[in-house]
């Protein structure tokens, strides 16, 4: 097994050991752009990184020079790596751009389980560019878009275009809540459409956006009349979450559900203009009938 050590200008990043002389020498020989801030990933044998109680190995330049002979050979253009002879063994050295990191490190930094990160890589849904170098998967953050993945989206929806004022009120309320919770909002999605219609293009695009980690909405019926728990479970399995601001309004509105269903059915039978009035009359008639039966 090998362990990956990352060297950046001025310091060596490793939780256990620092090898500035070794990594710096290798990076200087293998890459002419090391002075411009390039990184070098060096694969070392596991025994070289093991901790010893007496004197930790590979801590001083003298011990490094005594144990290791650095002779870069066999350049491999096009793959971004070269072979290095270290202590009689051939090891790979990978020179990467700034911002490159191991896929596991990227997953931990973005709050994603490593299993989900590998699954995204296999199905081609990883939201950042990645490349495989030997047995190592390196992730490159897009230039000019640092931290783009993992943003929060505010979702607001209305069933009728006559209530656009309420649509703006939803956006303002949810954004204020996110600001109070110190959650930066990276995207706002508004939509006008029936909660029973399952082919809402704007909402489906939001669900399929891998750069959105958290979706925040005022009430759960803004997502749809039914199926909230299913969508929440699917997003959770993908390392994402669905947040409802007004938890007090989570209780089912039976009258609202019936009105929505009747409106949808009346729109199919009689057209959209008369759908609302016919649905309201049907609900009122049902309420009167229920009152008479109670008497």
From Swiss-Prot:
Active site, renumbered: 159 (o-(5'-phospho-dna)-serine intermediate)
InterPro entries in alphabetical order: Recombinase/Transposase-rel, Resolv_N, Resolvase-like_N_sf, Transpos_IS607
One GO CC annotation: plasma membrane
Domain called Resolvase/invertase-type recombinase catalytic: residue spans: 151-290
Coiled-coil ranges (or none): none
Alphabetized GO MF terms: DNA binding; DNA strand exchange activity
Entries under NCBIfam families matching the protein: transpos_IS607
Listed PANTHER family: PTHR36172, RESOLVASE-RELATED (PTHR36172:SF1)
Protein name per UniProt: Uncharacterized protein Rv2886c
């Amino acid at each position: 097994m090998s362990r990956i050590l990352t060297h950046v200008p001025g310091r060596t990043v490793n939780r256990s050991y620092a090898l500035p002389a070794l990594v710096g020498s290798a990076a200087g020989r293998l890459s002419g752009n090391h002075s411009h801030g390039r990184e070098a990933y060096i694969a070392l044998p596991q025994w070289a990184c093991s901790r010893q109680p007496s004197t930790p190995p590979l801590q001083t330049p003298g011990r490094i020079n005594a144990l290791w002979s650095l002779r870069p050979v066999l350049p491999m253009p096009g793959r971004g790596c070269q072979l290095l002879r270290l202590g009689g063994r051939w090891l790979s050295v990978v020179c990467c751009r700034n911002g490159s990191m191991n896929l596991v490190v990227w997953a931990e930094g973005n709050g994603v389980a490593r299993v989900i990160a590998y699954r995204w890589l296999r199905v081609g849904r990883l939201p950042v560019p990645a490349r495989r170098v030997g047995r190592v998967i390196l992730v490159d953050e897009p230039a000019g878009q640092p931290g783009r993945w993992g943003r929060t989206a505010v979702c607001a929806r209305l069933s009728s275009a006559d209530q656009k004022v309420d649509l703006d009120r939803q956006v303002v309320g949810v954004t204020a809540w996110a600001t109070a919770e110190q959650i930066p909002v990276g995207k706002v999605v508004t939509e006008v459409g029936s909660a029973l219609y399952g082919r809402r293009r704007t909402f489906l695009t939001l669900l399929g956006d891998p750069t959105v980690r958290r979706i925040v909405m005022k009430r759960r019926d803004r997502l749809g009349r039914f199926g909230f728990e299913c969508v929440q479970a699917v997003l959770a399995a993908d390392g994402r979450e669905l947040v409802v601001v007004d938890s007090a309004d989570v209780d089912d509105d039976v009258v609202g559900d019936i009105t929505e269903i009747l409106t949808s059915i009346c729109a199919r039978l009689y057209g959209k203009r008369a759908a609302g009035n016919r649905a309201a009359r049907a609900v009122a008639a049902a309420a009167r009938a229920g009152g008479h039966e109670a008497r």
